[in-house]
UniProtKB/Swiss-Prot annotation:
PROSITE patterns: ZN_HOOK
Organism: Caenorhabditis elegans
Main location: nucleus
Protein known as: DNA repair protein rad-50
Domain Zinc-hook, residue spans: 622-719
Function: Component of the MRN complex, which plays a central role in double-strand break (DSB) repair, DNA recombination, maintenance of telomere integrity and meiosis. The MRN complex is involved in the repair of DNA double-strand breaks (DSBs) via homologous recombination (HR), an error-free mechanism which primarily occurs during S and G2 phases. The complex (1) mediates the end resection of damaged DNA, which generates proper single-stranded DNA, a key initial steps in HR, and is (2) required for the recruitment of other repair factors and efficient activation of ATM and ATR upon DNA damage.
Coiled coil: 222-291, 317-598, 622-660, 691-719, 754-1092
Length: 1298
């Protein structure tokens, strides 16, 4: 319990700031008396106590509260108030509040640092400073009393000592502060505002929920479109890969067939050429007449060389020409060798890359085998197809295992909670038993005390009997009282009081009617303003409603607007879906049109290019190429036919000339020439015939070569002409498709424009609705308030119609007149009452002694019963000790062991669960890494395949180079042989030449025969025809595959666009956060609803709790007041007093409020308001008792009250009565009875007065150790002295010296 020890005042009001001027007050128990004349600083003590405990000063200006600098003759005065007390926890505390005032140019009064020192039982001291904490809150916490109780109850100022009987408004304010209802009312107002804000937020959350729900649906649609497009693209890619594979196989087959056809055609051509050459050689051989050379060809060539060597100079030129050819051939061989070296270097690097590719293939195969092994796939399973499903199954299996472990862990946790609850239950039971034991021990102590009281009661009854006898003698000595006059006065007073109450009730009703009239006028103005606002809103948003539903509806607008919003959103959703479909169709058609346009441009460019190539090659149109080729082949055939016999004729005529010269006869008819002249003529004739052969043969060879080149060009042009015909046909088809596509796209664009216009209309309506939405909540609230105000106005009108009678002013005048008459009657009753006070006082004491004697007798009689109860309680304590021991030694260890075992199992299972979850995460991460590694390896292997193809090409190139080098070497040998041939002699040139020609022709014929023999079984023209037909068929198939590839490519482009649109939609912030926003909106909506519900429940609960709290506290206060009044009030006119609190519902805020009145109860049981109907003594007594009761109930652990001038405005007789009342109160609230026995908590009272009679009376009753006396010296400084019972006076500090 908090207790005040001492108070030190320095530099406050008239208290000086020097050490010897400090007022040091030690608070005595039960009463501390402070006496002194008026103006010596008695009230300063109350102000200092109020200031140190609550921080409140009696004036707003600190300069007026602090000691004057002029009186102190200083420029600076330091003021402080120090309070030493024991706090609610029994700790000794010292609170110091400091102030300072300065004078001069910068005069100011400031509050300095306040400190609170707390001394703990172990001797340590902790100091709190106002710089680091809320000093007022900390101090009130240690005292355990609210601020309002200190201000209005404990340390009430002299001017406010009778506030319990003040005006109702002021009384209500102070009682609300004491009950601390203001903060609860504010809390209710805040909760009401929060509920309204939550309702508005709930509407916002509902709209947000609908919006986010639309986003979620859009996201789902976009994701479905994306997945569908990806699936279609994947399918088209597979089809494309299949087509590419078919195309590659077809191209490979075409290449093989082309090679085969060319080989067959080359073989057939070679066969025909070889056969034609053999026929020509046979004809040439038949024309040669020389005898065969009997020897080898080398011998014959040797002789020819020797013959040429005899010619000398002409063969030297031929030799130089051959050497020049040899040099050129050597240069060509060096270039070929250099190219070969480069190719070999490149092949080496490519082989290294191929080897690296093989290692990558091995790594890829090993990685795929690992994946198959880890994912339990078959050895021949297609990993690209089955890996995703296998990974899903693998992860799902591990996740199921982890979930199973988590489930087991949850079960163990549930068992652990059960075990914990069991252990907690045992501990609670032990605590309950322990509390029961403590309670029983307290009851045992009380029973022992009662037994001891019963034993002491017998001795106390003898003293009480002697006191009763003395009181009866005193009562018999008093004069008799005229009871009839007193009764008549009381009856007359009650009659006037009833009439006054009736008039007051009528006056109150009239006042209420006047208030209702004022409220009615206010409501009328409010309704007028509200209707104008609603009309203005209707006029503002008339165009919006016209655009939405055609006309403005009646109020309320919220349901109609919500329905319209819902309909517009649904329409917008449907139109957006239709618009999206049309846009997709338009994009698809535009893509196809773009592809057709590109295809048309490509075909047109090919057509122009082929036409130009054909014209450049043939100088004719494509249709004339076949005819021109046919004519050219006829000419070529004729030229080849004319060229064949010329070579044979030349050789034959040369042999005839040689034979005629050597044999001297005609080689045809063997006729001998007679003279040499005939031989020469014959030879000359043959030479003339052979002179024209070389020129003609050369011309024919040139012609044949030219025609063959033209044939090659025209054959190529014929293929181009066929390709041109195909392109022209395909171009017509493309243009026809493009035309149909343009028509379809025009229709779709028309639909698109129509849908966009409809969507714009819906968006415009939505904008109108959103504009309405901004103020519809305000309009709805205004509408609801208007309806409530109209109902209230109608109610007030009906009530005002039924009310009649006098006005409030007339009734008030009657009340004042009747009150004046009542006061006169009360004054007469007080004069009579004064006579009966002494008798009532003696009778009251006599009754108290009788009651005390009866209680002592009952205590003595009940001592035996208390002894039996004591034995029962001791047995119950022993049973509690046994039960506590059993639970502590048996039940609690078992429960703790079970809980610890389950805790260990839960910990291990938690570790196992975390390990399983970590394994799932690691497996997912490892599989993702392996899949990524496999993709990179697969890509590198594909790149390695390109290196293999390049290696094959380079190897083919180097083979070609080797063949060219071999040919170069053969040519070199031939040139060298030719060169050597020029070193031979030139004898017998003609014969040897003919013989050499013959030998060559015969060798050629033999070689041609062998060549023709190799063609047996290889010449098959039907096979060539069949292969050409198959070749054309494959080309058609490849063309169809190409068209299919273009079609698939167009579709893939369209799907890619749709996919990009879906991805763009999904990449937006709305779609990315759609689920979380929707979930948050639902959560916010649910939380808001629950918050509204909880706040409503809490408000209702708080209302009920406040009502219950108020009723309980007020009941306790009235009980204490009734008890004190009956004990200290000596008259019989007022049986008791009480505080009446009437609950009133305030219409504006719909909250419960209280109106307070102090009522006095007469002997008849009638309750009358005490304010204005009681005497000054009754008023002071009632105020004092009310403050004591409030201090008892709301003072908590601080049983303290200070009375400043309690005898103010009291006459001499009333002062004596007040002294008796205070003495009785002090006696009633003593902590110990007359025998020194503990009775309850001790009460501290501080009485500050200038009335010596009151001081003497209280001194006789309480017998304090000393009395504090205040005075002032010649300098106006207040000083404090102690006056002891023997009359000696001692100054608290030494006297001031100058």
């Amino acid at each position: 319990m908090a207790k005040f020890l001492r108070l030190h005042i320095r530099g406050i009001r008239s208290v000086g700031d020097e050490d010897h001027d400090v007022h040091k007050i030690d608070f005595l128990s039960p009463c501390t008396l402070i006496s002194g004349p008026n103006g010596t600083g008695k009230t300063t003590t109350i102000e200092a106590l109020n200031f140190v405990t609550t921080g409140q000063m009696p004036t707003q200006k600190k300069q007026n509260f602090i000691h004057s600098t002029d009186v102190a003759r200083k420029t600076r005065v330091d003021a402080s108030v120090t309070l030493e007390f024991i706090d609610v926890k029994g700790r000794e505390c010292t609170a110091v509040r400091r102030l300072v005032v300065t004078s001069g140019t910068k005069a100011a009064a400031l509050a300095e640092e306040h400190t609170l020192a707390i001394k703990y039982p172990d001797g340590t001291v902790n100091t709190l400073s106002s710089k680091v904490c809320d000093f007022n809150t900390a101090l009130l916490k240690h005292l355990g009393v609210p601020r309002a109780v200190f201000k209005y109850v404990i340390f009430c100022h002299q001017e406010d000592s009778t506030w319990p009987l003040s005006e109702p408004k002021e009384l209500k304010k102070r009682f609300d502060d004491i009950f601390q209802l203001t903060k609860f009312v504010k809390a209710q107002e805040r909760m009401k505002k929060i509920v309204l804000d939550f309702k508005k937020e709930m509407q916002t959350h509902e709209m947000s929920k609908q919006l986010y729900e639309t986003h979620v649906r859009d996201k789902l649609v976009a994701r479905q479109n994306q997945e569908e497009c990806e699936r279609k693209i994947s399918k088209r890619k597979e089809e494309t890969d299949e087509l590419k594979e078919r195309k590659a196989n077809g191209q490979k087959k075409i290449e093989e067939m082309r090679t085969s056809i060319h080989e067959l055609e080359d073989t057939l051509t070679s066969f025909k050429k070889t056969e034609l050459e053999r026929q020509n050689l046979k004809k040439q051989l038949s024309l040669i007449r020389v005898e065969p050379y009997f020897g080898t060809e080398e011998e014959l060539k040797r002789e020819i060389e020797e013959f040429r060597g005899s010619e000398g100079r002409s063969y030297g030129e031929e030799r130089a020409r051959i050497q020049k050819k040899i040099g050129k051939n050597n240069q060509e061989r060096q270039e070929l060798s250099q190219k070969k070296t480069e190719f070999e270097n490149r092949i080496s690097s490519l082989k290294a890359e191929v080897i690296h590719c093989q290692s990558l293939k091995y790594d890829l195969e090993r990685l795929e085998n690992q994946l198959r092994s880890e994912l339990d796939l078959e050895h021949d399973a297609d990993i690209d197809i089955e890996i995703d499903n296998a990974i899903t199954l693998k992860i799902r299996g591990m996740s199921d295992k982890a979930r199973m472990i988590a489930k087991n862990c949850a079960e163990l946790q549930s068992n652990l909670r059960t075990a914990q609850e069991a252990a907690t239950k045992i501990e609670v039971e032990m605590k309950t038993l322990q509390n029961e034991k403590v309670k029983l021990e307290k009851e045992v102590e009380q029973l022992k005390f009662k037994i001891k009281q019963g034993q002491n009661a017998t001795a106390g009854m003898k003293d009480l009997l002697k006191k009763e006898e003395a009181l009866r003698k005193s009562l018999a000595d008093l004069p008799l009282l005229d009871e009839n006059a007193l009764t008549e006065c009381k009856l007359k007073r009650e009659k006037y009081l009833k009439q006054l109450d009736i008039l007051k009730k009528k006056c109150a009703e009239a006042e209420k009617n006047a208030e209702k009239d004022r409220e009615k006028e206010s409501l009328k103005q409010t309704l007028s303003i509200a209707r104008k606002k609603m009309t203005a809103y209707q006029r503002i948003y008339d165009n919006n409603w016209q655009g939405l539903i055609g006309q403005a509806p009646d109020f309320p607008w919220t349901p109609i607007l919500s329905k319209t919003f819902h309909k517009l959103r649904n329409d917008k959703k449907i139109m957006e879906e239709d618009l999206r479909d049309v846009q997709l169709n338009v994009q698809k058609l535009e893509t196809m049109q773009h592809q057709y346009r590109k295809q048309e441009e490509s075909l047109t460019a090919q057509e122009l290019k082929l036409s130009e190539n054909i014209f450049e090659a043939c100088s004719c149109e494509a249709e004339e190429v076949s005819e021109k080729l046919e004519n050219l082949r006829k000419r070529l055939k004729k030229a080849r036919k004319d060229l064949a016999p010329l070579s044979a004729k030349s050789n034959l005529y040369d042999s005839y000339i040689e034979e005629s010269k050597s044999s001297g006869c005609c080689p045809l008819c063997d006729r001998d020439f007679k003279t040499k002249k005939e031989i020469n003529e014959f030879s000359k004739k043959l030479e003339n015939m052979t002179l024209s052969f070389p020129t003609e043969q050369e011309e024919l060879e040139k012609l044949v070569s030219k025609l063959e080149k033209e044939e090659i060009i025209i054959v190529k042009a014929e293929g181009q002409a066929n390709e041109l015909q195909r392109i022209v046909k395909e171009l017509k088809e493309v243009r026809e498709k493009n035309r149909k596509l343009s028509t379809e796209m025009a229709e779709e664009k028309s639909n698109l424009s129509k849908n966009e216009k409809q969507l714009e209309t819906v968006n415009a309506k939505l904008k109108l609705a959103e504009d309405l939405q901004t103020d519809v909540g305000v309009i709805q609230q205004l509408y609801e308030q208007t309806e409530e105000n109209e109902k209230r106005y109608e109610q007030l009108v009906s009530e005002s119609d039924s009310s009649d009678g006098l006005s409030y002013t007339e009734l008030r005048k009657k009340v004042e007149d009747k009150d004046e008459e009542y006061r006169k009657i009360v004054q007469e009753g007080e004069e009579l009452q004064k006579c009966s006070e002494e008798r009532n006082k003696l009778q009251s004491k006599l009754n108290e002694l009788g009651t005390h004697r009866v209680s002592l007798g009952e205590a003595a009689a009940q001592a035996g019963a208390f002894a039996e109860q004591l034995e029962t309680k001791i047995k119950e304590i022993q049973e509690c000790i046994t039960a506590i021991s059993q639970k502590r030694n048996e039940d609690l260890p078992d429960a703790q062991f079970k809980k610890d075992d389950l805790t260990r199992n839960v910990s291990s299972k938690e570790e196992e669960k975390k390990k399983a979850e970590m394994e799932v995460q690691m497996m997912k991460k490892e599989l993702d890494q392996k899949i990524f590694h496999r993709k990179s390896l697969f890509k590198k292997v594909q790149e390695g395949g390109l290196c293999e193809r390049q290696l094959m090409d380079k190897e083919n190139n180097i083979a070609t180079l080797n063949a060219s080098l071999e040919e170069n070497q053969q040519r070199q040998k031939r040139f060298e042989e030719d060169l050597r041939s020029f070193d031979s002699s030139h004898q017998r040139e003609s014969i040897l030449k003919d013989q050499l020609t013959r030998m060559i022709i015969e060798n050629k014929i033999k070689e041609l025969k062998r060549t023709l023999a190799t063609f047996d079984g290889q010449i098959n023209e039907d096979r060539i025809t069949e292969q050409k037909q198959a070749y054309n068929k494959l080309q058609n198939e490849l063309r169809l595959i190409g068209n299919e590839e273009v079609k698939i490519y167009t579709q893939m482009q369209e799907y890619e666009k749709q996919k990009k649109i879906a991805e763009a939609k999904l990449s937006t912030k709305e779609c990315q956060n759609a689920e979380s926003n929707y979930r948050d909106a639902i959560i916010e909506l649910a939380i808001t609803k629950e918050s509204i519900s909880d706040l409503t429940k809490y408000r209702n609960c708080l209302d009920a709790s406040l009502i219950q709290f108020h009723s309980e506290k007020m009941g306790r206060v009235n009980g204490i007041i009734d008890d004190l009044w009956r004990k200290v009030y000596n008259s019989t006119d007022i049986t008791t007093i009480r505080i009446r609190s009437d609950a009133t519902s305030e219409t504006s805020s719909k909250k419960v409020a209280y109106e307070y009145n102090v009522m006095m109860v007469h002997e008849t049981g009638t309750e009358v308001e005490m304010r204005g109907r009681c005497s000054a003594g009754q008023k002071m007594l009632a105020s004092l008792l009310i403050r004591i009761a409030l201090a008892e109930v709301f003072g908590g652990s601080c049983s303290m009250i200070a009375l400043d001038e309690p005898t103010t405005n009291l006459d001499e007789s009333k002062v004596e009565g007040m002294a008796i009342v205070l003495a009785d109160i002090i006696a009633e609230r003593r902590g110990f009875d007359e025998n020194g026995k503990l009775r309850g908590r001790d009460m501290q009272m501080v009485v500050i007065t200038h009335d010596e009679r009151l001081v003497n009376r209280i001194t006789i009753s309480c017998r304090p150790e000393y009395i504090y006396c205040l005075g002032k010296d010649e300098h106006g400084i207040s000083f404090l002295s102690k006056r002891y019972p023997d009359g000696t006076v001692k100054r608290v500090n030494t006297k001031r010296r100058f």
